[in-house]
Amino acid sequence: MAEKDNIIELRGVTKNFEDTCALDNIDLEIRNGEFLTLLGPSGCGKTTILRLISGFEKPDAGVITLKGQRMDDAPPEARQVNTVFQNYALFPHMSVRENVGFGLRMQRRPKDEIARRVHDALRMVHLEAHADRRPRQLSGGQQQRVAIARAVVNNPLVLLLDEPFSALDYKLRKQMQLEIKHLQRQLGITFVFVTHDQEEAFAMSDRVVVMNDGKIEQIGSPQEIYEEPANLYVARFVGEINILNAVIAANHGDGLYDAVIEGVTFPIRSQRTFAPGDKVNVLLRPEDLRVYTLTEDRPAGPHLTGRIEESVYKGATVDLIVTLSDGRRLMAAEFFNEDDVDINYNPGETVTVSWVDGWEVVLPDGEA
């Protein structure tokens, strides 16, 4: 995405709830027209950010701006921001059509405009046929989709979504991810999405904000977050990761080092600066590893030796658990090819493990 003006900025924002620090001196810039996801475990502060942006909470310190204007004390109704929360908050006495059009009626929009926009919103969430039903006649997933339609129909500058797909089944959740992303591109407005689901965040987002304990750990594109984690917390949170302890043996310059892993010297690459003797962690995703049996031709170069502990068929991939000589376990993922007999491994079989040069991520030892 090209660089754009910021529509929302949080500068030095802190929020406490009694003795708990929900947000600790947060700085965050949200770009106009982007799909930004706040990703993290329960209690990390991601929903608190949504509530501060929407005006349902006030910061204890710091500044929040919308289009350059301070919004610290502005009530929710004065902000061009709509929110979809986990609880649906639908009016039980109104039909689906009336629920979706409620905000437009409060704005005294023309009836034909209301009818058109409500119809378009319901079509987006595949509920046109349910327009005259009451919320109690809908499933939980359908009620959540009504809430999304009600928020989108007002064409806000910013739409905030707090885990809106939590009530949906797997298939519908996948479908709604595509629909919401498509809708966001159509409308061109900023979406701020909250989830604890890494796959969901990566599928929908232009940028992802990884949070932990009231702080931001990393901001970047899904690819940056996955392939270039800033620290061990991010690396562990966004997927399976293998962590190998290593010691720098030599610095050859231009980011090329020799590192000793399990008594074997490997070439590694990093933009960070290390000195011989430094302890580091070498991070490798399961799909980065290459596993070879002793009867296979393998590329020349250093390798680790271990035994197959488990082989798990997952359809598109086969996950291998390899136990090294020191007892450390590695997970490798190989794409399944039914014509490739070499992908069939036996428990206890001796194998060698290596990886493509430069695919590793290197972090200082002890970096959280």
UniProtKB/Swiss-Prot annotation:
SUPFAM superfamilies recorded: MOP-like, P-loop containing nucleoside triphosphate hydrolases
EC number(s) given by UniProt: 7.6.2.11
Extent of the signal sequence: none
Protein's UniProt keywords contain Transport: yes
Residue ranges occupied by any ABC transporter domain in the UniProt entry: 8-238
Binding site for ATP: G40, P41, S42, G43, C44, G45, K46, T47
Catalyzed chemical reaction(s): ATP + H2O + polyamine-[polyamine-binding protein]Side 1 = ADP + phosphate + polyamineSide 2 + [polyamine-binding protein]Side 1
Subcellular location: Cell inner membrane
Entry keyword Zinc-finger: no
Protein name in the entry: Spermidine/putrescine import ATP-binding protein PotA
